[in-house]
């Protein structure tokens, strides 16, 4: 991962699936670092790899706040992907882990927008809608918790 991640690119103009890869690699680097001495060579390599994943996640953040994996608005350096609650939550957890392991963090503005987006996607039932466009239909099956006791939600 340390050798190959610097070469990871978007698959095409539509898919921003690489966001998932940067997120999970950041998790892997953070988890592995927890068992290493901070002055070891491997820890420093992991930290550098993690730093590049955080940089990429900053670059891949949606201007709407959060992260998405599909963009229908054409190709741009900063994807115009519609953010999803589950990818945004996953990125924020990974960033938190990187903070604990390496002292790394997302850009403050990006973090604030992502957190604001995520909070806006929460329904009164405590679930999160799938994505921004689903905010208008919180009761649709895709937005409901499978075990929700009230099927009318």
Language-model segment annotations:
Residues 4-55, 59-112, 116, 120-153:
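An alpha-helical repeat/solenoid feature that recognizes helix-turn-helix modules
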